[in-house]
Regions:
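Short, solvent-exposed loop/turn elements at domain surfaces
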Residues: 80, 103, 115, 179-180
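A generic alpha-helix surface/boundary motif
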Residues: 76, 134-135, 150, 228, ...
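Short linear capping/connector segments at secondary-structure termini
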Residues: 59, 63, 95, 108-110, ...
């Protein structure tokens, strides 16, 4: 089964009986030997971010302030993971109203020329795209164009069991449909020509040839197939291409000028180079210019630190930076109603997870990982951006960084999506 993001075949158990499907994983020592990664100190950067109404601190919280000593501990934690896992570059932003701000860029953005990581770089954000696609769906529900309990067969033909699978179940990862990105033929097609373009219908074909994993609604099982279908629903009900709908109805109202839904492999600059071992040979390659069409509504989008800081709170609250609603309160409550997963402390709602109070999503696709979450109880926001998706010790690095940072900054609310070891 798939991870909590848009990866290819590597999987984790978020249901009790799930088994991992392995890809060759390059050891950390191999990365360092091949690419010569050295520990690089952080650059402290001030990032201009628009004021977010309602961001005053709560009256009390168990979290420490982000003073010099705490920042030194955070620096050490990030550097430690980078050294252990041979991470080329990472940018971290942590905003805690009334307690301080921590923004750091570590390491390098480009192995070829040694350019440093920086907070203003564009990055591919993988499955964080799901938060935008599901927000579009919820907007259309608010406008009476769709109903969450409609069957997917009302909008998309040819879906196995489409008369029984609802839009709500798709958004909540409870459809039972096979994850197309775990199909062997899809993996070969992508890695043999990673710059090729896929259509949503081509991708769905890789899923629909497999039997359903369970009856709709039975449990949470992460599948990128669900989001492809919801993307098609948004296009049909919204009357325009998915990227255009998201741009006009979400990005522009939220002021997210550095976030986009690319229609091809185009990547605005400046951006970090991304490194992956999700390749045909298992060797590390530069995946920066791989075509993200294979992930489409599940993971094709691009953003930066500034925009993701704003988006984190928007997703968690359902309101725009100026305080006006992006979706109705009723649908926001439904979005945040989570179902438990096999990972302790983690639940999944409609296109978002809640991990010990942190609400948001992570993302991963070849070359990049990200984490964008908001903690309403402390009005805190955490964004982590990496230019590699190579796991270490069977764990995604965005989770490793998120856990290490929140153990220090918000010890009462530790973010962890650590995967249980699985056989196979």
């Amino acid at each position: 089964m798939a991870r909590w993001c848009g990866r290819l075949r590597r999987g984790v158990a978020i249901a009790a009986a799930a088994a991992a499907i392995g890809l060759p994983v390059a050891a950390g020592a191999v990365w360092g030997a091949v690419h010569g990664v050295a520990e690089v100190g952080p650059a402290t950067v001030d990032v201009a971010v628009p004021h977010i109404p309602g961001s005053a601190p709560p009256s009390a919280d168990e979290a420490p302030g982000l003073g010099p000593e705490v920042k030194r501990r955070l620096d050490a934690a990030v550097r430690g993971i980078m050294k252990e896992a041979r991470v080329p570059g990472v940018t971290v932003g942590l905003w805690m109203p009334g307690k301080g701000t921590y923004v750091r860029a570590f390491g390098i953005a480009d192995q070829h020329n040694g350019l440093p990581m920086a907070p203003d770089l564009y990055m591919r954000i993988g499955s964080e795209t799901k938060t935008f696609t599901v927000t579009a769906l919820l907007q259309l529900a608010d406008r009476g164009r769709v109903a969450l309990d409609d069957p997917i067969g009302k909008y998309v033909d040819g879906v196995p069991g489409g008369s029984r699978i609802t839009l709500r179940q798709l958004a909540g990862m409870r459809s039972g449909l096979f994850n197309y990105s775990e199909d062997e033929a899809f993996f070969r097609a992508l890695t043999s020509d990673p710059r090729r373009s896929f259509t949503p219908r081509q991708l769905l074909g890789y899923s629909f040839k497999h039997p359903a994993l369970f009856p709709p609604g039975q449990k949470v099982d992460y599948s990128n197939t669900n989001l492809l279908l919801l993307g098609l629903v948004v296009e049909k009900a919204g009357g325009r291409p998915l990227g255009d709908y998201i741009r006009d109805n979400i990005l522009r109202p939220a002021g997210l000028g550095h976030t986009l839904f690319p229609s091809d492999a185009a990547f605005p600059g400046p951006h970090a180079q991304g490194y992956t071992n999700q390749t045909a040979s298992g060797e590390i390659e530069n995946a920066t210019d791989w075509n993200p069409s294979w992930a489409w509504a599940a993971g094709a989008m691009i953003s930066d630190l500034r925009d993701l800081r704003v988006w984190a709170r928007t997703v968690a609250t359902g309101t725009l930076p100026d305080g006006t609603p992006l979706i109705s309160r009723a649908l926001q409550r439904q979005r945040l109603t989570v179902r438990p997963t096999a990972i302790p402390g983690a639940g999944y709602g409609l296109g978002v997870f809640d991990v010990n109070g942190w609400i948001g999503h992570n993302g991963s696709l070849p070359g990049y990982e990200s984490l964008t979450v908001h903690l309403p109880s402390a009005r805190a926001t955490l964004v982590v951006l990496l230019n590699t998706d190579i796991d270490h010790g069977g764990q995604e690095l965005s989770t490793r960084f998120g856990e290490a940072i929140t153990k220090i900054a918000t010890p009462g609310h530790v973010f962890s999506l650590r995967v249980r070891p699985t056989a196979g």
